[in-house]
């Protein structure tokens, strides 16, 4: 089955699962097919998935991940390497910290962090470019199902400042660590700052418990959760450094992954 046939098959099979989508017109253009498939994956509720569908999905997603360019840990310089390159002194835990700008789903590290919502099932908005949607879309339908199985045992929504870990499925990382950061609805408060620190700490703790040696953090809560970027970066770095004071031997590398230029500038100023 070629790529175009795989797209048609997956759209057809996902359409059959939901009566509302059974009569969807399948586009001729492969890019339009791919957009439709992502939308159908995004809105699919958790539930049993046929092995045949998963096999075709995986055959589609894995080449897409490779085509984006998988980034190995060895390709990302540490803070100290960066500082040395520009003639600066070593920084606190600079041999274990990195700043990297780009798509977190490209990173071949032990675990990446997903900024989730309290349902912990991924983003259901078709084609939305939040990190929750991007990670779930690249990992595959298995990720939502894995999250659902954990949430089903919990019988409640996920509290702010905690973390859960799942396999990463079609991503180049081994695991995804999911955390719900605080939502800033009005002004920033000490309680919200503590909640964000708790999210970072919970991710670090669950990473250690699962022998994760290389971990990439996204910018938790700075998107639709409206946490101020500067304050969030300062909390992220301070929390990670404080954790390394007691657990430095547990990690080979912790990466602060940013996507926006403004976040890159903020982290660079704080780290470099």
Regions found by a protein language model. Name each.
Residues 1-272:
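Macrodomain-like recognition of ADP-ribose-binding/processing modules
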